Amino acid sequence: MNDSSHAFSSDGRAGPPASPVVDTAAVPGVEAGVSPLVEGENVLRAHGIRKRVGGPDGELVILSHVEMDVSAGEAIAIVGPSGSGKSTLLGLLAGLDSPSEGTVTLLGKDLGSLDEDERARLRAGRVGFVFQNFQLLPGLSALENVMLPLELAGEGDADERARAMLADVGLDHRAGHQPLQLSGGEQQRVALARAFVSRPALLFADEPTGNLDTDTGEKVVDLMFSLRGKLGSALVLVTHDHALARRCDRRLRMDGGRLDALADTLPGEAGGTPE
């Protein structure tokens, strides 16, 4: 995936759940009765997505004819072997890269019609990101990292909301610490605070537990699902963790550049094919 600064700056399957009722009273900084979602509509749609890159042996097709819809409040897991194109797809869906063919509509906006600054503003205001390696900016404090998307979106109460969000993840006492002064689990909790502080309609998570031990990873995942449940945020999750994938409403498998709905068993589970 691209560096997180690009996310914020210009530089089996169950059907989609009913549109959630957001427990706004439980979320710091969220006004009563205000939902960040467009109820009953897709927050993300990908149509006919292909991604090709040049190589020494000619053109390489990374993604081929990908179709995908995500409804408001829905959680979708994308699984598959390493190198299958999962993270590439996530970057395209988030507008961090552009497809060779096809269209991505994010929160009602055709990403192909937006310039880089417009994409960055859209992400800063309505989209959250969580990465495997945390992607916190090392020169900023935990508080400043959490404030970043709010400041880029022009929000006037960034400090207050960021402090409330850090308290919600149990790190208000670490607000002045820089990332290297924090443990891996603490860094990922700061990343979650940054991802959710803008009350996102959609969260992209790329292997969020990949650099954490099992116990810490489980706590981070519980926190992520708790926060998204309170806000009603949709989730697109790339993971190798089968237990984590099972917590989602739908599971899709990426293999050979193609995306397919997955049956009730995942590879490596009883009845599944090992990866």
Q: What is the meaning of each model-derived region?
A:
Residues 1-52, 260-275:
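ABC-family P-loop ATPase nucleotide-binding domain
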Residues 41-254:
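ABC family nucleotide-binding domain
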